[in-house]
Amino acid sequence: MPITKATPLFLRYRLKGFVFLTLLLVQGVFTACAPAVPVNNKSVSAVQPEDKQALKPDPALGEYTSDLKFNTNFIPKKDDPFRPFYDLSFTLQFQDPYTATYGTGWLIDWKDNNQPNKFTAYIATNLHVADNLRNVNDYEFFNQFDYFDDPTESFTLGKFVDGNEIKQIVPDAMHEPSLVRIETSKLPKTAYTTTLFINDLGEYRLPAADFAVLESI
């Protein structure tokens, strides 16, 4: 029987109550017939499949494993063709009062300062990495950043090294390979920048073709 404006008020409430009880009864029947599903933190809609043995990278292998879908960190051996790239590559960290920005650089030249344990290193990197440097003492041509920007407080070089080599210098250090960081004695300066050193990549790729050299002591 449809509910209309002509239906008496008391009958409307009886019909609506009947519909509500019917829906509640149907829900109870379906709930009682449904299979029990264990509840966990991930989902209550289905039984979770058994976890497979997690694949863990093994740095000792020093090679790409297709099952892992990524390259693990390892140190190339002396006769590895990638060893020269490893020897010259470093992580770069620019630290301002609030944030730390990271990049990668490689040593392309150096200059003897005629001072014990000091030399000037010329580190190549991408311009968008070097752009994080805010050194008020930078060379005049490159010292044109907004002075409202947070200045760089420290510059750090890092390298993934063999734990046994570290232990020769620091006896209490761990044997495991680890990332070692060393802060330079002074903030670097910008020695060179360009975005035109590659001209045949096509217009859509030129924004990524940037290059810079940092002078660090």
Swiss-Prot record:
<feature type="signal peptide">
    <location>
        <begin position="1"/>
        <end position="32"/>
    </location>
</feature>
<dbReference type="InterPro" id="IPR009003">
    <property type="entry name" value="Peptidase_S1_PA"/>
</dbReference>
<keyword id="KW-1003">Cell membrane</keyword>
<keyword id="KW-0472">Membrane</keyword>
<dbReference type="Pfam" id="PF01732">
    <property type="entry name" value="Mycop_pep_DUF31"/>
</dbReference>
<keyword id="KW-0732">Signal</keyword>
<comment type="similarity">
    <text>Belongs to the MG067/MG068/MG395 family.</text>
</comment>
<feature type="lipid moiety-binding region" description="N-palmitoyl cysteine">
    <location>
        <position position="33"/>
    </location>
</feature>
<keyword id="KW-0449">Lipoprotein</keyword>
<dbReference type="InterPro" id="IPR022382">
    <property type="entry name" value="Mycoplasma_peptidase_DUF31"/>
</dbReference>
<protein>
    <recommendedName>
        <fullName>Uncharacterized lipoprotein MPN_590</fullName>
    </recommendedName>
</protein>
<feature type="lipid moiety-binding region" description="S-diacylglycerol cysteine">
    <location>
        <position position="33"/>
    </location>
</feature>
<dbReference type="InterPro" id="IPR022381">
    <property type="entry name" value="Uncharacterised_MG067"/>
</dbReference>
<dbReference type="GO" id="GO:0005886">
    <property type="term" value="C:plasma membrane"/>
</dbReference>
<keyword id="KW-0564">Palmitate</keyword>
